[in-house]
């Protein structure tokens, strides 16, 4: 069986590339197709496969400014020659599923998320743009929406990385999706006997992560909050935390320190809405519970009352009610049980489920 894997771009190792690595292990002879490829920025496993790029990589500054060429990516995808492949697996977050396959080929799309900058986060991405940029972007985004919707029909079977994304696939493409949560690597994480008095926020300091909500809540409750990460909201958050010694914003940290902070925290605070969210599972693998806003992909990974606590409104007051319930001992979180739950999302489990599903849809 001849297999092709289509991935949006290869210029780093993020969650999508971890899924790609699993696909590479499951299909060691597969060819990879992508828009942009920087071998030095991806793993040896990915580099061991034959990688073909679209014409985007050949355009001026294509490797660095590839997102500026987004309007050309539909044409670039449709020019990729996938004749001769029996199975095509597209890995979609940026444009990937719009390839044209043989009528006899099976096309499975693993969807991390429909393109957020085209659909639900369009206004978030462009609200700070000038009038001219918004004027130019509007017709281009409209065109991309129409193209993206139409290419949903080119996919034979959708897989969503969470129940939340499955609902978005149904909403946007009017298609059902099998839910297979993405792989998480837990080898580095362990339970510690030394738990400190701080709560932890970890991730990019961008608007949708709602780190500001955690800062506001912990200014009010006076408990120690350690924040690890960086991003466009960093200066704003530091200004917000001025004069509050219990808010400790540390910026980027080495992985070894992140591992230590996970295992030593009282609980992870997760105030945003994400497509899935690896961070809560890493905290649970370290034996620590999660206090999360009860919406989005976290509903697949955190079990309310057993591995964490949900707060139901995205407000500081609602978050602090959940923190108060944790402090009052209303929940009996067992570190070993938290870790055991996290391990059900391990890479080996993901690969078993993914292979079984793909095998089931092949003729």
Residue ranges and their predicted role:
Residues 130-158, 166:
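Membrane-proximal helix-turn-helix segments that form the acceptor-binding/catalytic region
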Residues 263-275, 288:
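Acidic donor-binding loop of glycosyltransferase active sites
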């Amino acid at each position: 069986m001849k297999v092709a894997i289509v991935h949006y771009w290869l210029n780093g190792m993020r969650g999508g590339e971890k899924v790609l690595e699993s696909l590479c292990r499951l299909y060691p002879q597969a060819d990879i197709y992508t828009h942009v490829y920087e071998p030095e920025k991806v793993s040896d496993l990915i580099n061991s496969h034959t990688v073909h790029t679209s014409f985007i990589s050949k355009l001026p500054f294509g490797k660095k400014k590839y997102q500026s060429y987004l309007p050309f990516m539909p044409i670039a995808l449709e020019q990729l020659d996938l004749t001769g492949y029996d199975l095509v697996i597209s890995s979609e977050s940026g444009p990937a599923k719009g390839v044209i396959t043989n009528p006899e080929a099976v096309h499975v799309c693993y969807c991390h998320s429909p393109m957020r900058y085209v659909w639900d986060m369009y206004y978030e991405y462009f609200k700070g743009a000038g009038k001219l940029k918004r004027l130019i972007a509007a017709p281009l985004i409209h065109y991309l929406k129409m193209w993206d919707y139409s290419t949903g029909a080119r996919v034979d079977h959708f897989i969503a990385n969470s129940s939340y994304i499955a609902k978005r696939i149904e909403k946007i493409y009017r298609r059902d999706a099998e839910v297979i949560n993405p792989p998480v690597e837990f080898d580095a994480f362990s339970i510690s006997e030394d738990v400190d008095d701080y709560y932890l926020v970890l991730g990019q300091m961008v608007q949708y992560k709602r780190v500001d909500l955690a800062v506001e809540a912990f200014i009010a409750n006076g408990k120690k909050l350690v924040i690890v990460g960086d991003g466009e909201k960093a200066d704003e958050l530091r200004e917000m935390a001025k004069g509050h010694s219990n808010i400790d914003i540390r910026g980027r940290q080495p992985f070894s320190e992140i591992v230590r902070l996970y295992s030593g925290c009282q609980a992870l605070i997760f105030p945003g809405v994400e497509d899935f969210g690896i961070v809560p599972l890493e905290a649970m693998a370290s034996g620590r519970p999660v206090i999360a806003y009860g919406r989005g992909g976290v509903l697949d990974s955190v079990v309310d009352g057993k591995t964490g606590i949900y707060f139901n409104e995205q407000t500081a007051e609602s978050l602090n009610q959940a923190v108060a319930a944790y402090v009052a001992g209303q929940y009996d979180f067992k570190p070993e049980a938290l870790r055991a739950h996290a391990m059900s999302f391990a890479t080996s489990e993901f690969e078993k489920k993914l292979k079984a599903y793909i095998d089931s849809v092949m003729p």
